[in-house]
């Protein structure tokens, strides 16, 4: 029983790393922190459908967010997205 739990934990950790690691590689870092505006669009799990905004490197673009998961490059309005991510 202990071996099965250990293998399940290793499998879960592996899946989480496979999902998270590529997004972190594509992100930019400032002062050791991830710049959320450089993260890719991530709709999360599609349990619901919310119209949200993400910064695509140039401007803010609409996308459908599933309501769970995803990353922090997600804003409720275009104005909030531009305020956080647009460079003056």
Curated annotation (Swiss-Prot):
Keywords: Disulfide bond, Protease inhibitor, Secreted, Serine protease inhibitor, Signal. SUPFAM superfamilies: BPTI-like. Residues 1-27 form the signal peptide. One of its GO terms (molecular function) is potassium channel regulator activity. The keyword ATP-binding does not apply. It is found in: Secreted. Expressed by the venom gland. Transmembrane segments: none annotated. GO terms for cellular component: extracellular region. Gene3D superfamilies: Pancreatic trypsin inhibitor Kunitz domain. Belongs to the venom Kunitz-type family. 03 (sub-Kunitz) subfamily. Serine protease inhibitor that inhibits trypsin (Ki=9.61 nM), kallikrein (Ki=24.8 nM), and chymotrypsin. PANTHER family: EPPIN, WAP FOUR-DISULFIDE CORE DOMAIN PROTEIN 6A. This is Kunitz-type U15-theraphotoxin-Hs1e.
């Amino acid at each position: 029983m202990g071996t099965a739990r250990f293998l399940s934990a290793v499998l879960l950790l592996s899946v989480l790393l496979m999902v998270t690691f590529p997004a972190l590689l594509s992100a930019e870092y400032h002062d050791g922190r991830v710049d959320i505006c450089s993260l890719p669009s991530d709709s999360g799990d599609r349990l619901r459908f919310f119209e949200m905004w993400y910064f695509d490197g140039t401007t803010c673009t609409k996308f459908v967010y599933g309501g769970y998961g995803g990353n922090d490059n997600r804003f409720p309005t275009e104005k909030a997205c531009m305020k956080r991510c647009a460079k003056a």
